[in-house]
């Protein structure tokens, strides 16, 4: 059986789209078995190119993930070897700052696009497909400056898309695609007879409304879930993160016909054809057993053993703080094919398992000082915001993963809470004040291992 459906009659070009590849150069363990890999996407692409013209578009975030802290350098060369045709810059592309990103792009043979940020990256590109030119516009995350070392997007950046699309069409583009590094708000579906996840697109629709009608297709990303829908009448979709799935779109040969998003499909767990330092580092970490878990822990709403709670307990005990708190969206190990965002499976725990949960060389948590009553306040406010039924919270920019926080408290009214440093701005927003923090002396990976024993 072919892993992807045959193209619809009248298809001129097929698009395969991915997001947040995160240097997944080798398959890794997930809650549902083996996850996909970059090499698996290449397998799908090569098979599709035997059947019809096919292009690969990506929504960015290439080198976030375990490979960077394991290797000590970002594996840009590995990602540059992938036969991608065009990509948008993700927020993690800016983690090391703009100069480092511009230097890194020198090894990429495909364009990394960013129309809504003035940093020296191209805004658009023309991709030759074998069936006519495809115009591509790249858009990074609208709040990239809050997520990385990037400047804010340009004022009124949505107004740039229309002129870019018209310019591409005037240059001969048969179709124009916008790649946006953002996705829907989603949450695990607790109905055993329903799909693994549910989603709403109000926040994404607000972002795309000024320009969605100017393009033929929107490819999204950034969030762990896969989704298909429409924005202002334009077909849109995004794959799951970490090469878990690929989004398939058929572009019609007839000019008046609309692109058809066929859906997302799992990526096979293919091993890379060539060993590189990054591949060797990932393989070594995957075979380096550092501990054992008696149970399977999942980041899944309602799970018997909720992984964010375990991490919160580990941070609290390691730091001596009165409490620990973990936002589920901040610790991703997989795409949500089964509704799970992170998993620590029963049995041997490897270095790679821990690196997926804390993919930084410096994994020290931070201790945040709290005033009386503030811990209960921040937990309650986060719960109200993350609640999937809270439609008035759909437009909170960081609220795309509607799952409960992991919480561990040693006292009724803790005077400090241990969190990972990147969570501090969210707590400050929820408490509406600046927060004083102190870095811990122990790392989160070591803390989690101790919590498992």
Segments predicted by a language model, with ranges:
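Acidic, metal/ion-coordinating pockets
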Residues: 1-271, 306-314, 369
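Catalytic centers of hydrolytic enzymes
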Residues: 4, 8, 14, 23-27, ...
């Amino acid at each position: 059986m072919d892993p992807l459906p045959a193209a619809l009659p009248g298809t001129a070009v097929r698009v395969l789209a991915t997001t947040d590849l995160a240097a997944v150069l080798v398959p890794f363990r997930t809650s549902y078995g083996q996850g996909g890999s970059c090499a698996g996407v290449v397998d799908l692409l090569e098979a599709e190119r035997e059947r019809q013209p096919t292009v690969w578009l990506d929504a960015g975030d290439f080198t976030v993930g375990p490979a960077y802290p394991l290797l000590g350098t970002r594996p840009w060369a590995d990602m540059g070897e992938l036969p991608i045709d065009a990509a948008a810059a993700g927020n993690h592309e800016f983690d090391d700052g703009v100069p480092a990103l511009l230097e890194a792009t020198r090894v990429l043979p495909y364009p990394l696009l960013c129309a809504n940020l003035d940093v020296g990256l191209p805004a658009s590109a023309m991709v030759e497909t074998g069936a006519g030119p495809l115009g591509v516009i790249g858009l990074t995350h609208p709040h990239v400056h809050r997520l990385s070392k990037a400047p804010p997007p340009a004022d009124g950046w949505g107004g740039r898309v229309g002129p870019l699309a018209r310019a591409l069409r005037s240059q001969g583009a048969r179709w124009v695609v916008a790649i946006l590094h953002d996705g829907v708000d989603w949450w695990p579906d607790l109905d055993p007879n329903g799909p693994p996840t549910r989603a709403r697109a109000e926040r994404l629709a607000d972002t795309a409304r000024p320009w969605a009608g100017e393009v033929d297709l929107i490819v999204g990303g950034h969030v762990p879930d896969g989704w298909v829908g429409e924005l202002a009448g334009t077909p849109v979709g995004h794959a799951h993160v970490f090469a878990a799935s690929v989004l398939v779109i058929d572009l019609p040969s007839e000019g008046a016909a609309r692109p058809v998003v066929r859906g997302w499909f799992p990526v096979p767990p293919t091993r890379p054809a060539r060993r590189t330092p990054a591949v060797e580092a990932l393989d070594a970490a995957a075979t380096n057993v550092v501990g054992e878990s008696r149970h399977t822990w999942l980041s899944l709403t309602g799970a018997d053993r909720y992984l964010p709670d375990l991490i919160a307990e580990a941070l609290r005990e390691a730091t001596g703080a009165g409490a620990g708190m973990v936002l589920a969206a901040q610790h991703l190990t997989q795409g949500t094919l089964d509704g799970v965002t992170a998993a620590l499976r029963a049995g041997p725990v490897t270095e790679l398992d821990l690196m997926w949960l804390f993919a930084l060389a410096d994994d020290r948590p931070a201790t945040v000082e709290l005033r009386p009553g503030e811990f209960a306040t921040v937990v309650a406010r986060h719960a109200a915001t993350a609640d999937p039924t809270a439609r008035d919270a759909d437009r909170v920019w960081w609220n795309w993963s509607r799952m409960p926080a992991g919480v561990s408290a040693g006292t009724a009214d803790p005077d400090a809470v241990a969190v990972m440093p990147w969570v501090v701005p969210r707590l400050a927003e929820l408490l509406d004040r600046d927060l004083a923090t102190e870095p811990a002396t122990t790392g989160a990976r070591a803390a989690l291992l101790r919590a498992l024993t």
